Design a protein with these regions (language model features):
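N-terminal signal-anchor/first transmembrane alpha helix
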Residues: 1-49, 107, 116-122
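Interhelical loop and adjacent transmembrane-helix boundary motif
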Residues: 23-27, 59-62, 67-74, 236, ...
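Membrane-embedded alpha-helices of multi-pass transport/permease systems
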Residues: 37, 44-55, 95, 99-103, ...
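Membrane-interfacial helix termini and adjacent extracytoplasmic/periplasmic loops
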Residues: 17-21, 134-175, 209, 242-249
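Transmembrane alpha-helices
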Residues: 33-37, 41, 124, 176, ...
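C-terminal transmembrane helix and the adjacent membrane-cytosol boundary/short C-terminal tail
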Residues: 2-5, 14, 19, 104, ...
Length: 306
């Protein structure tokens, strides 16, 4: 009896855990599961729902998209023009932020006196919020704002300068609110470049500009492209600055405003189509940026051997 029992083949484990182990799943899956559920509930489902809604226009099918590209929305006669307006705002604002952030981050990585205080000052606009910044810029740059009053008092100008209600005012606000985010990303990437590379180049007689252009800048380029991409996404979704500082009649009528107006008037298909076009436009720009990044240096930024 005991010999027969010993010769029996042990049963294969069964149950959910055994099924998961047999297919390569581990207990780490349970750690990832909340994130997957969150993504499905708050990202994938809204995107799929919005995409489906965008095909339910007045004539069904792609009529909402056709109306967008022919400027035929019932409550917005310049929807397609708003796409170019948004790009003309977001791209220059992002480029200016990157051009300002790169040299500052490069200088800060070497260490400066009061680095924490200076970094905190640069980060202040991010903590204020875009609505507060837009309202502040109205008081600062408006026809009766402090800047114009100072210029008039000093007799530098005879009439107030038009710095709000136009393209320039929105662009300035976008740069002001986007710069801290851009700087923070660039500072993190610049800090990852080994300072010994600069020291070695300096010992070989390279000056500061030579070291920057020939050593640091090529190493920074992958980080610059990522920073540009993320900053562009932030600028492309501009709404408070364009609404409070711009002119909805045309010069600064951005896509987010078009979507808001259509949604407010119950044209949900048009609003969803506008949102989908916004997403595609961003993906195209990001695709170009990442294509450029794929051709850049992707090796180590440390000065170690090997």
């Amino acid at each position: 009896m005991s010999a027969a029992t010993a010769s029996r083949t042990p049963r294969a484990p069964h149950g959910v855990r055994a099924w998961m182990r047999a297919r390569g799943f581990t207990s780490a899956v349970w750690l990832v599961l909340p994130g997957v559920v969150f993504m499905i509930a708050f990202f994938i489902y809204p995107v799929v729902y919005g995409l489906n809604l965008s095909f339910q226009g007045r004539n069904g099918g792609v009529s909402a998209y056709a109306d967008f590209f022919t400027n035929s929305f019932p409550h917005d006669s310049g929807s397609f023009d708003s796409l170019w307006t948004t790009l003309k705002l977001a791209l220059p604002a992002t480029l200016i932020c990157v051009l300002i952030a790169v040299p500052i981050a490069w200088r800060f990585r070497a260490g400066v006196r009061g680095l924490r205080v200076l970094t905190a000052v640069i980060m202040i606009p991010m903590t204020l919020g875009s609505v507060f910044v837009a309202e502040s810029f109205n008081n600062l740059l408006g026809p009766a704002g402090w800047v114009n009053r100072l210029l008039l008092t000093l007799h530098i100008v005879r009439t107030p300068l038009e710095m709000t209600g136009n393209f320039a005012g929105v662009l300035i606000a976008l740069v002001f609110t986007g710069l801290p985010f851009t700087f923070l990303l660039m500072l993190g990437y610049a800090a990852g470049i080994d300072a010994s590379l600069d020291r070695a180049a300096s010992m070989l007689g390279a000056g500061p500009l030579q070291r920057f252009w020939r050593i640091d800048f090529p190493l920074l380029l992958p980080g610059i492209t990522i920073t540009f991409a993320l900053s562009f996404v932030l600028s492309f979704a501009v709404f408070p600055s364009a609404t409070l500082l711009g002119n909805d009649a045309g010069p600064t009528r951005v896509l987010s405003k078009v979507a808001y107006v259509e949604y407010s008037n119950g044209n949900y298909a048009n609003a969803s189509a506008t949102a989908m076009i916004m997403a595609v436009a961003q993906l195209i720009v990001l695709g170009v940026v990442f294509l450029i990044r794929s051709r850049l240096y992707r090796g180590s930024t440390s000065g170690g051997k090997g």
